[in-house]
Amino acid sequence: MPTVMPDVANQTQAQTEGALDWVGMSNIEVPLMVAAAGVPERPVAAKVEAFVNLKNPKTKGIHMSRLYLLLDKMSTEGELSHDTLKQLLNDFIESHKDISDQAFIKFDFDYHLRRKSLISKKQGWKAYPVSLTGRYDAGQLKLELSVDVPYSSTCPCSAALARQLIQDAFSEKFAGQEQVDASIMHEWLGSTEGIVATPHSQRSVAEVKVALSDSVNDFPIVELIDAIEGALKTPVQAAVKREDEQEFARLNGQNLMFCEDASRRLQHQLNQMSNFRDFWLRVNHYESLHAHDAVSVTTKGVPGGYSA
């Protein structure tokens, strides 16, 4: 009876020879503690992709269990930070040192933040989809952070058309009157007869991806989310009372946006942030008027960097 279990990956050569760019696993479910700048560490439930290259064309395969166990060790013994991510990628390569010299990992998770309402200051949770990606190649670490931030966009064209209809309704209602009593006007403006039209608006999402500088240790997740919401002015809310809804309506009216406007606001904001070497962004306006979406994509324009 054999006493040693066979190791096909080590003991067998590839049937068809060829180097492979990436081999590994996806959809690994892992709980993690994430170190984000400016806030305490917090737990997340992540789905992970873990890969190494296979540079030896004759090698049958990689040792996936080694990658899995290294990831599990980080999950149970440490936190996800710049240093631990770099060490994890180094360990991936070291565990395959004869057949691999590149490593890749990606963490996808929802990052929950407490958000105050606009006026009442009630609080609620908002979940932001986040991805952290690391690649180690030729001794260099490349880190990337991406977030999705929902917001409201109100169409400038639709707002102008609605205002025109209100003007027409006013002219019809008070035709022939040289003067109109202020109290009557006030009451009329507060009625559906007075406000005969409203502009269309829709939930929208900003997808933002940034290349992190080498000096980053704790990930600037909250900083990036705050910057996006601050530039757009109309983030989707959590807890909402009537006074908050009214303020949200005011903010939408004062921040009318085509997708081009939203994209340029974010472009301007991200250009001011020195801890991001590069960025790529896409704004998606999920139109309530049209059956299609309105989309704008732009980048920082770094030579050799992200492309649209």
Swiss-Prot record:
Catalytic activity: GTP + H2O = 7,8-dihydroneopterin 3'-triphosphate + formate + H(+)
GO biological process, any: tetrahydrofolate biosynthetic process
An example molecular function term from Gene Ontology annotations: GTP cyclohydrolase I activity
InterPro entries named among the record's database cross-references: GTP_cyclohydrolase_FolE2, GTP_cyclohydrolase_FolE2/MptA
Class in the EC hierarchy, top level: hydrolase
Site (May be catalytically important): 155
Known role: Converts GTP to 7,8-dihydroneopterin triphosphate.
Family the UniProt entry places it in: Belongs to the GTP cyclohydrolase IV family.
Protein name: GTP cyclohydrolase FolE2
Native source species: Idiomarina loihiensis (strain ATCC BAA-735 / DSM 15497 / L2-TR)
